[in-house]
Design a protein with these regions (language model features):
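PRPP-associated nucleotide enzymes
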Residues: 1-121, 125, 129-214
Length: 214
């Protein structure tokens, strides 16, 4: 599959926006610099042809990995996982990041058996907190998790954090890879390229790192 064509499709869909954005990071580090970009992969669900190509790309990363179930990280990862599960004719489950207080109070939606292996799918990885939370819920229910698959790695420590937790993260694109494609195709200016590249360089303030999105 032509990854450059997929990258161009993502740009055309508006998933990468430029400006000055407050992120989840600013809740704990209010003095952190504003992000010069924002990646909104939730938009992909509105473009069926693009979603088809994106999920095929993610399926390619899953070839050779061993798993019995596909688990999403709600809610951003849900459409990707649902379509991939349908394409592969594999069962899908969903860990509940918010504890259900009614009905069965299940921590995981869907049918599964303790001892089965689940592969976790999400849209992107930054600092990995939501991935680690989802994995812990699955493990607490007796499932095995060894691999995480995402569309974009923002290259802000998430892959390393998952590795430290014993998880292999497979990304279709690194952010720097997308930026190089967009720069070569003149979809972004040299100034935008430099602004994002500078932002991704780790910095520290009193309360911790300033780049990225938890």
């Amino acid at each position: 599959m032509d990854k450059q064509a997929v990258a161009t499709g993502l740009f055309a869909a508006g998933v990468i926006r430029f400006g000055a954005f407050r992120l989840k990071l600013h809740e704990s580090v209010p003095d952190a610099p504003l992000s010069p970009f924002y990646i909104d992969l939730r938009l992909v669900r509105s473009y069926p042809d693009l979603m088809d190509r994106v999920t095929d790309l993610m399926i390619g990363l899953m070839r050779g990995l061993k798993f019995d179930l596909i688990a999403d990280v709600p809610t951003a990862g849900t459409p990707f996982a649902a379509i991939i599960a349908h394409k592969l004719r594999m069962p899908m489950i969903t860990p509940r990041l918010e504890h259900k207080q009614h009905g069965s109070r299940a921590r995981v939606d869907g049918a599964y058996t303790a001892g089965q292996t689940a592969i976790v799918l999400d849209d992107l990885v930054t600092h990995s907190e939501s991935k680690l939370e989802a994995v812990q819920i699955l493990v607490d229910q007796g499932l095995v998790v060894t691999d995480v698959v995402v569309l974009v790695d923002r290259e802000q420590g998430g892959v390393q954090a998952l590795k430290a937790a014993g998880l292999d993260c497979h990304a279709a694109f690194r952010l720097s890879e997308l930026l190089e494609i967009y720069k070569e195709q003149r979809l972004i200016t040299p100034e935008q390229f430099e602004a994002i590249s500078d932002y991704l360089v780790p910095r520290t303030v009193a309360n911790g790192p300033t780049s990225g999105l938890p």
